[in-house]
Amino acid sequence: MRTLTVHYLGQIAYTAAWDIQRQLAAERSRGQIGDTLLLLEHPPTITLGNKARPDHVLASPAELAARGVAVVQSDRGGEVTYHAPGQLVAYPIFKLSQHGSDVGRYVRGLEESVIRVLAGYGLVGERVAGLTGVWVRNGAAKICAIGVKLSASGVTTHGLALNVDPDLSGFDLIVPCGITDRSVTSLAFELGQAPALAEVAERLIAQIGEVFALEPRVEALAM
């Protein structure tokens, strides 16, 4: 079984994590490293994917500045989303040819990993036809957003954001993923208490390893 190298980055600015992803993706493309997984949190940040509409950012620049919320135009797929402490972010740097060479299948694998994590907490995670991510309560509320990019050399960047215990009011600043008729939720809200982020991270690592047939190994990141 191939190794999955896992790096914990703690809380890190979106742009700084993006720089790290690009460097690791270049190394993965050249075969200098194997499949890699970054786990982290972001400070309050709104990101716009390549399908995002600017008017789906509902707050004014002045309001966002007053609340300390950064806004970043990203090169990931998808629309507008919100990041904040208490949200577990996972960025896989994978050579897709080793996982079926199909972006849709890869995204379904990320969804499956999260669905299995939720099952461990007694929650039923679901897919919604025509939408990306993981949902609960029969598709009424989104608990995990997914947006990825595939490079010309077939290496993935960006990934998933699982709401463990973020301040959900931040999602009121946007139209999350361009969807107006469904809400956003978290593990803390659904369970009535927040599991430790480190515990959720360990479970997510294990499930990504199982779904993608990789053996996780946690290492410090040397850049």
Curated annotation (Swiss-Prot):
Enumerate the UniProt keywords alphabetically. Acyltransferase, Cytoplasm, Transferase
Q: What GO cellular component entries does it have?
A: cytoplasm
Task: Respond yes or no to whether keyword Lipoprotein is given for this record.
Answer: no
Query: GO biological process: what's one of them?
Result: protein modification process
Which enzyme class? transferase
Q: EC number(s) of the enzyme?
A: 2.3.1.181
* Compartment(s): Cytoplasm
A Pfam family it matches = LplA-B_cat
* Catalysed reactions, semicolon-separated: octanoyl-[ACP] + L-lysyl-[protein] = N(6)-octanoyl-L-lysyl-[protein] + holo-[ACP] + H(+)
What are the residue boundaries of the BPL/LPL catalytic domain, all occurrences included?
31-216
> Which GO molecular function entries does the Swiss-Prot or TrEMBL record give?
lipoyl(octanoyl) transferase activity
Q: Where is this site: Lowers pKa of active site Cys?
A: 142
Entry's family note:
Belongs to the LipB family.
What does the further note read?
A: In the reaction, the free carboxyl group of octanoic acid is attached via an amide linkage to the epsilon-amino group of a specific lysine residue of lipoyl domains of lipoate-dependent enzymes.
Q: Could you tell me what this protein does? A: Catalyzes the transfer of endogenously produced octanoic acid from octanoyl-acyl-carrier-protein onto the lipoyl domains of lipoate-dependent enzymes. Lipoyl-ACP can also act as a substrate although octanoyl-ACP is likely to be the physiological substrate.
What name does UniProt use for this protein?
Octanoyltransferase
What gene makes this protein? lipB
